UniProtKB/Swiss-Prot annotation:
It is a multi-pass membrane protein. The chain crosses the membrane at residues 171-191, 194-214. GO terms for cellular component: host cell membrane; host cell nucleus; membrane; virion component. Keywords: Host membrane, Host nucleus, Membrane, Transmembrane, Transmembrane helix, Virion. The keyword Acyltransferase does not apply. This is Protein AC81. Its main location: host cell. Pfam families: Ac81. Plays an essential role in the assembly of nucleocapsids with envelopes. It is found in: Host nucleus; Host membrane; Virion. It comes from the Viruses.
Length: 233
C-alpha cells in the first residue's frame, strides 16, 4: 500500500496578508467607479445637492469689466429668453422643461437650467419655444439672477420647479398632476369611471398645453429702461 504525500497548506500568515491586499484593491476600484458614475450621472449627484453662490456668479460676470471694456457704459442691456422644451427622458412629451438663455451686457452668454444639476449652467445649444423675453439693465439683471440662484438652491419638483422659478407663477404642470394624483387615490378607495375619465382629460390637457397650445411670446422691459411696456409679437 502506497501513500502520497500532499504539500502542506500555506501558512495562515500569508493568507491573512493577501486577503486584505485583495480587498483593498477591489474597494479602490469600486470607489473609483462610483466616483466616476457620480460625476457622470446627474441623478446620483442629487444626494449631494450643489448650493450655488449668486454673488460669486455676479462677480465673474460683471466685476472688472468697467475698466476693461470702454463700451460697457453704453451697453447696459441684458437679455434673458425664457423657453420651454419637451422632456424626452421621462413622461414622454406630457411634461415640459423650462430654461433661460442669458446674454449679459459684458459679453457672456449661457443657459440656466433649474433642477438639472450638475448641468445647471450650460453653453448656448438648446432650441426651445420662447415664452417671454426680458430686457434688463445691469442692476435688474443681477436681481433676476439672484432670484434664479435662490430658486435653484431650494429646488423641488412639486412646488419649486423650473416653471415656477423662471416664470414667477404657480406651475401649471404641478396643479394638473396634483389633481390627477388626488383623483387617482380617491379612485382607489372608491372606483368610478367618471373619476377615471377626468384623470384622462387632465393628462390630455397637460399634453395639449405642452405641445399644441402655443402662446405668443412677449417682451418685458425693466423700470430703468426708456421703454417700460410689454409687447406681444
Amino acid at each position: 500500500m502506497t501513500t502520497t504525500e500532499r504539500p502542506p497548506p500555506p501558512p495562515l500568515s500569508m493568507s491573512k496578508k493577501e486577503t486584505p491586499t485583495l480587498l483593498d484593491s477591489i474597494s479602490k476600484k469600486i470607489s473609483t467607479t462610483e466616483t466616476l458614475q457620480r460625476l457622470r450621472n446627474k441623478n446620483l449627484t442629487t444626494l449631494n445637492k450643489i448650493k450655488y453662490d449668486s454673488e460669486l456668479l455676479l462677480h465673474y460676470l460683471y466685476d472688472d469689466h468697467h475698466n476693461k471694456n470702454s463700451d460697457y457704459a453704453n451697453n447696459n442691456i441684458n437679455v434673458i429668453k425664457i423657453s420651454k422644451v419637451k422632456v424626452k427622458k421621462t413622461g414622454a412629451s406630457i411634461l415640459a422643461h423650462y430654461f433661460a438663455q442669458i446674454h449679459v451686457s459684458t459679453g457672456y452668454s449661457f443657459e440656466f437650467h433649474p433642477g438639472s444639476q450638475p448641468r445647471t449652467f450650460q453653453t448656448i445649444h438648446t432650441d426651445g419655444l420662447i415664452i417671454k423675453v426680458l430686457i434688463l439693465c445691469d442692476e435688474c439683471c443681477k436681481k433676476e439672477l439672484r432670484d434664479y440662484i435662490k430658486g435653484e438652491n431650494s429646488f423641488n419638483v412639486a412646488f419649486r420647479n423650473c416653471e415656477s422659478i423662471l416664470c414667477r407663477r404657480v406651475s401649471f404642470q404641478t396643479v394638473l398632476l396634483t389633481c390627477a394624483i388626488l383623483l387617482l387615490l380617491f379612485n382607489v378607495e372608491k372606483f368610478s369611471m367618471i373619476n377615471l375619465l377626468i384623470i384622462l382629460l387632465i393628462l390630455l390637457s397637460l399634453f395639449c398645453h405642452n405641445n399644441y397650445i402655443i402662446s405668443n411670446p412677449y417682451i418685458e422691459f425693466c423700470n430703468h429702461k426708456s421703454t417700460n411696456k410689454k409687447y406681444d409679437r
